[in-house]
Amino acid sequence: MPESILSVQNLVKRYGDATVVSDLSFAIAPGECLGVIGPNGAGKTTTIRMCLGLTVPDEGTVTAFGLHMPKDALAIKAQLGVVSQMDTLDPDFSCAENLLVYGRYFGMKDAQIRERIPALLEFASLTAKANAKPGELSGGMKRRLSLARALVNNPRLLLLDEPTTGLDPQARHLMWERLQLLLAEGKSILLTTHFMDEAERLCHRLLVVDHGKKIAEGAPRDLIRQYLEPDVVEVYGSGALALADSPLKAMAARLEVSGETVFFYTADAKPLLQALAAYPQLRTLHRPANLEDLFLKLTGRQIREDA
């Protein structure tokens, strides 16, 4: 395996009596996208902040490009690109000016930045908006501008904290296309997300965290095979909940109830589907197990207080 571009070892962060990150370790190889998924309050954003040197860990180490955070913070940040959850674009500057001003923070000369701006705007599909201010942009345009800004210094590693939250499906797909282009160029990405389709589409590996602890790690399809039965049958409609205590329960390896829906997890859905034909008033959906099933199995279906 290639040498890690980012290595996190035994990170711990406490706030008072609460441990929000507990003995967390992971690494990212060059050209790899590592996704971090978990419920609200699982410690994802705190982990990103420690990787950026914005939050000091109580225990553990962060090493990037062979350098140590926070001792070598400036040298590390010169090779990082960051897209945070919140919009941090300057509302008083145009798109092009946002890129120019941001590049100056890295000590880049104006001429060097101006040379990069046209390609960055083209990458973000914002060439026609070069002179527009952020307030004139859609949500998707703002996120793409934030991504373009994160690329001003030509970073080796991108840290993206829920980069597509709040975007409509079309804007999310366009953002995914841009991120896939960056991966094809050999850049590395550390990504937090609540979208399981995003995680499956972009990430080579996933880190599942809950209550600040790593509870699973691996390639998306490998994790699904490891933790889940291959077939899922969702049943809903009048009388569906009664099936949870019916003889059909024996036809599934595992059964879950959420709201008005019963989820049957099985290695072979055919006998179950045949039995369900006796309940024409019910609606059924037969599908393969996916990352959302994995997420819910490992972290639970209960909504967290800060969700």
Task: Set out the residue ranges of the language-model regions.
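Conserved ABC ATPase signature
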Residues: 133-137
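Catalytic Walker B motif of ABC-type/P-loop ATPase nucleotide-binding domains
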Residues: 158-161
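Conserved ABC transporter NBD signature motif
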Residues: 60-71, 76
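ABC transporter nucleotide-binding domain
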Residues: 176-267
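Conserved catalytic motifs of ABC-family nucleotide-binding domains
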Residues: 154
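Conserved ABC ATPase "signature" region
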Residues: 100, 104, 111-129
